[in-house]
Curated annotation (Swiss-Prot):
GO molecular function terms listed in the Swiss-Prot or TrEMBL record: DEAD/H-box RNA helicase binding
Stored PANTHER family: IG(IMMUNOGLOBULIN) AND LRR(LEUCINE RICH REPEAT) DOMAINS (PTHR24366), TIR DOMAIN-CONTAINING PROTEIN (PTHR24366:SF161)
Side of membrane Extracellular, spans: 19-513
Subunit text: Interacts with glh-1. Interacts (via LRR regions) with myrf-1 (via C-terminus); the interaction promotes the role of myrf-1 in the synaptic remodeling of DD GABAergic motor neurons at the cell membrane.
Tissue-level expression: Highly expressed in the pharynx and at lower levels in the intestine, but not detected in other tissues. Other studies suggest a broader expression pattern in somatic tissues: from embryogenesis to adult stages, expressed strongly in body wall muscle, vulva, somatic gonad and pharynx, at lower levels in the nerve ring, hypodermis, and rectal epithelia, and very weakly in the intestine.
Deletion consequences: Larval lethal. Animals developmentally arrest prior to the first larval molt and subsequent growth is slow, although larvae survive for up to 8 days at 20 degrees Celsius. Animals also display uncoordinated locomotion, a shortened cuticle, pharyngeal defects, stunted gonad development, and abnormal vulval morphogenesis. Heterozygous worms have reduced brood sizes. Knockout in DD GABAergic motor neurons results in defective synaptic remodeling of DD GABAergic motor neurons.
Primary role: Regulates diverse developmental processes including larval molting and gonad maturation.
Protein name stated in the entry: P-granule-associated novel protein 1
Length: 594
């Protein structure tokens, strides 16, 4: 009862004080006239302005002793602040009265060497602080009662400390906190009940913490948790039931650990599952079931060698899944019906594997394209595999972006891309000598956004009008994003159709000739005009000789200065441009080494 009365009295006192309007000038008058290590005032004030997300004044105190900072903050007398930042000060133990006169929505105490927190250190911030940042300090342990009184806090940032141990109940009073950042610490074990009381927590970040063990019940009570980031740790053998209570979980990131087996069941709201850069060697080791909201699944940078017909059966109910990544594995075998359980895929990433063809062979040697069931696929990444042939029935007709670069492709069948509205096509760094006429007929050169066919051993017959690819690339203009040599495809007019009257080079020479003639005529006319003006000038000067007296040197100097023909030697004669000839459709000529 006494503590409640004290809180009410303190609140009333602050309200009474805040009625008196202050400015940064008024606030800084109360600060001590001393300077920090950079010869600047210990604390300065700034107004956040009308466009800031944080209303009120900002106080910044940098590179000074905590005693000096404390003396300056004492003068605030409860003035309402938007943000208080204390940075690069020296403090090992946080004084309990440091924030006694502070009333701020955001409080940051960063890079101060802080190692010890005392109970109730932040109690005076309870009625105002919504964000508390203690990142980049040296805190080693979080004890129970440290955060007592922070009843309005929504974000707690403890990243980049040296935290090794968290007492059970350390966060139990942070009932309104929605985001907790603990990344880049040294928390090897998460104990049962570590996050008790955080019923409104929505995002928990624990990446890069050397985490090895998560005890059962560590996440109990986190009924509102939506994002759990556990990447870049040393997790190996996980009891997957530790996540079972997280029914509102939308994102689970377990990337860059040592996980070899996965078992995720009954997460009705899970949208993104990240398991990249682990030690999974088989899709059979990934058991997924009842994930109806799953949209993105990332399994890249593992050791998966094959995908069987039933390996992804658990995703049958995940009819919202759009993106699947298996890049940078050791994939060489994909069964004919491997993707039949994920027919709604839009993006499939298979680059940097050992795939040799896009079809599988049954025991009876019947060839079956394994991408045939993906009728909605828009983006397919197959870069850096061992593909040698692309057949006419192997690619989904829905494709818009196709990457086949850095393979050993020597043949693409004439109808392989038929019916596709390709926007981005990458065929560079293969072994293509030619493409059948009509290969690109389904998409016009004007409609593509990017195409690259460079670094192939192209063979061209430039005097043959049937040599279509050079003309197609020329028509694509800026969409041709070739990063390497195009070989004979870059020869000007290669494959040019007969009947063209003026080649681009001839047209340029023709146009340049007319410009030269026009410039010569204008030069001669100008010289004639200058001669006539000079003659008139001397004729006029002859009638001035009978005048008495002589011009002074200054008169002669003035005469020369005012002479309209006194043109500097480096003057530029501007020749009017000749009218443009009607040359028909615009032609683009590309000059490249070949």
């Amino acid at each position: 009862m006494r503590s409640l009365l004290s809180f009410v009295l303190l609140a009333l006192a602050r309200i009474a004080i805040s009625e008196e309007t202050k400015s940064c000038i008024d606030i800084e008058k109360g600060f001590k006239e001393e300077f920090n290590a950079h010869k600047q005032p210990v604390c300065i004030c700034a107004d956040n302005g009308i466009f800031s997300t944080v209303k009120g004044f900002t106080i910044e105190c940098e590179s000074a002793s905590i005693a000096s900072v404390s003396e300056n903050l004492a003068s605030l007398n409860g003035t309402e602040l938007g943000r208080l930042t204390i940075r690069d000060s020296t403090v090992n133990v946080l004084p309990q009265d440091l924030f006694e006169n502070v009333f701020a929505k955001q409080v940051k105490l960063e890079r101060c060497g802080l190692s010890t927190l005392q109970p109730n250190s932040f109690q005076s911030l309870g009625g105002s602080a919504e964000l508390l940042s203690l990142r980049e300090n040296r805190i080693k342990k979080l004890e129970k009662g440290l955060f007592t009184g922070l009843k309005s806090l929504k974000t707690l940032d403890l990243a980049m400390n040296k935290i090794q141990e968290i007492d059970v109940g350390a966060f139990e009073e942070l009932k309104k906190v929605e985001e907790l950042l603990l990344n880049e610490n040294d928390i090897r074990v998460l104990k049962t009940g570590t996050f008790d009381g955080m019923k409104n927590l929505k995002k928990l970040t624990l990446q890069n913490c050397n985490l090895e063990i998560i005890q059962k019940g560590a996440f109990r009570g986190l009924n509102s948790l939506e994002q759990l980031i556990l990447s870049n740790n040393n997790l190996e053998n996980i009891d997957w039931t530790i996540f079972s209570a997280l029914k509102n979980l939308r994102v689970l990131d377990l990337g860059s650990n040592k996980i070899s087996n996965v078992e995720m069941k009954s997460f009705p709201k899970l949208e993104k599952l990240v398991l990249n850069n682990n030690t999974i060697d088989s899709m059979k080791s990934i058991k997924l079931k009842d994930l109806p909201s799953l949209v993105v699944a990332l399994f890249d940078r593992n050791k998966i060698e094959s995908i069987g017909d039933m390996d992804m059966f658990g995703l049958t109910r995940s009819d919202r899944i759009e993106t699947l990544s298996l890049a940078r594995n050791n994939l060489s075998q994909i069964s004919p019906k491997a993707f039949q359980h994920t027919p709604n895929l839009i993006t499939l990433l298979l680059q940097y594997n050992q795939i040799e063809e896009l079809s599988s062979h049954s025991p009876s040697q019947v060839r079956t394209p394994f991408l045939a069931s993906l009728k909605k696929l828009v983006t397919l990444q197959l870069s850096s595999n061992n593909l040698s042939v692309i057949r006419s029935d192997e690619l989904p007709k829905s494709l818009s972006s196709l990457a086949l670069d850095h393979n050993v492709i020597s043949k693409i069948e004439a109808r392989a891309l038929e019916g596709m509205e390709i926007k981005r096509l990458y065929l560079h760094s293969n072994k293509l000598n030619y493409l059948y006429q009509g290969t690109f007929d389904s998409f016009s050169p004007k409609s593509v956004e990017a195409v690259d066919v460079s670094l192939n051993p192209w063979v061209c017959v430039c005097n043959d009008p049937k040599e279509w690819l050079p003309r197609w690339l020329e028509a694509s203009e800026e969409a041709d994003v070739a990063e390497g040599a195009l070989g004979c495809l870059a020869i000007p007019n290669c494959g040019q159709k007969e009947g063209s009257t003026v080649m681009p080079e001839e047209e340029e020479v023709y146009r340049s000739g007319w410009i030269t003639v026009a410039a010569t005529i204008l030069t001669i006319v100008t010289i004639v005009i200058m001669v006539i003006i000079a003659m008139l000038y001397f004729k006029d000067a002859r009638y001035q000789f009978p005048l008495r007296g002589r011009r002074s040197d200054s008169d002669l100097h003035k005469l020369i200065e005012n002479d309209p023909l006194n043109i500097a030697s480096d003057s530029i004669l501007v020749v009017p441009a000749m009218p443009k000839r009607n040359t028909g459709p615009k032609k683009t000529v590309r000059f490249q080494n070949f």
